[in-house]
Amino acid sequence: HLSQSPISSLPFPGFENVRLTHRQLVAAVRNDTWKTALGNVQAVYLQTDRRTGWHYVGSAYSHKGAEQGLLSRWSEYAYGDHSGGNKRLKELGAKYIVDNFQYSILEIFDMRALPKDIINREHWWMDTLSSVYHSEDEHPHGYNSVAERNSDNPVE
């Protein structure tokens, strides 16, 4: 099963079969086959907190050709700030994320897709999975902020 196997020994399984722990994510962004696949698409992806079931929906797009799509975004999660700048994820801390989060791909786009189109799909997935945190919710289950959901602007 992919979620329990070491990435270094597995071929890329196809975008629809990606489900990685944080440790596997780190291995994937180092693996040449995975790097090629992830670097050639833009995407809407899902982070799942396996402990609580909460979700975070994010998008990865190349702004002015400067980034390598999903590879750039997931490399940030692997090596940099595990929160991607999200306030609620930051509050959890890096160790919690490493121990409890898994990463999957909801939808892919070729590198010519416009950021606004990807963001529209990201918002659709946020609404579909109810991943936006509202303080008035009796049982919230999402890490996305209202500001993230309402923003129509690509991140600079």
Residue ranges and their predicted role:
Residues 132-139, 147-148:
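Long, charge-rich alpha-helical interaction segments
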Residues 33, 92-95, 128:
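A generic secondary-structure signal
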Residues 34, 54, 74, 124-125:
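A residue-identity detector for tryptophan
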Residues 112-133:
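Domain-level recognition of nuclease-like catalytic cores that cleave nucleotide substrates
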Residues 144-156:
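Active-site or metal-binding loop neighborhoods of secreted/extracellular toxin and effector enzymes
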Residues 63-113:
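Conserved short loop/helix modules at catalytic or binding sites
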Residues 1-57, 61, 155:
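GIY-YIG nuclease catalytic motif and its immediate N-terminal context
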